[in-house]
Amino acid sequence: MANPICISPLKFYDDFHKQNRYRSFAYGYVAPLITNPNVVSPFQLIVSGNVSEVYVRSANTNKRVTDNVVERFKDAGLRNVSKNSYNILLFLGIFPLSGVIDYEGQYWLEIHSGEWYYSEVFCFDNNIDDCLKVEYWNPEGDFALKNGIIVLGSENFHFILLLKSELGKPEYSFEEEATKRLGYSFIESQVSKKTYKFNTVIPEYLCDAMRIIRLCSQKKITCKGETYDAITFNMEVDWQEQGDLASVTCEFDVDNIITNLGGFKHEALGGDFNNDYNNDYDIE
């Protein structure tokens, strides 16, 4: 069995030993996905059958810390969806999982949906004030993958990602179109833009998940209580020396563009081309 098709922030594998911390260059270091207690980030993956069992395991001991909580997850939005001959296991994450795990710590999921699937490590954290939240979705339609599909439009599915970061100093850019005549520049149009930036250090599986952000038509970024509706999103990945983490610089624009069409002057009082003020070229 190969890894299931999964490009969610909470990635799944066919063997928990494929988690990022077990890679040779990670040396056991855990770079978990951050969530609020009782909240598991929305995810979806291609599976071979309907879901029947869900367990939560401790990342410290790899032992189960819950009984089968599949019904609790179903109440919170877990279900199987059939699309284009694929069986997709969706978790919308729209309701909290109260009573499943009520305290901070690092955990991972063990799910049986035709076969066994194992999630990446996630961290329940009571304090996410220093986190930046990225929510992205695409109501216009689904995304196609080789041997899979990302279901978005038909299920109102939203990805949610919390990152240890905050918005840095913005950049200001200007675009200008001008015509030069007789040594003078005549401005035809000017555009001023403000671009926001942030930097975060994350493992490869989160870099994979963030590829989807740019493709989605709807992108909301929240930092320190302020929410921005991004109209563009770009990311640049710089792998660190050890190799298991990347410094990712992200930038996005919002609809704050200022435009000057230039050159047009409204003559409120009218005028005449030769100043004789008869009826030949009177302008109202």
Segments predicted by a language model, with ranges:
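Preference for solvent-exposed, low-hydrophobicity sequence contexts
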Residues: 1-143
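Extracellular/virion structural assembly segments
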Residues: 120-284
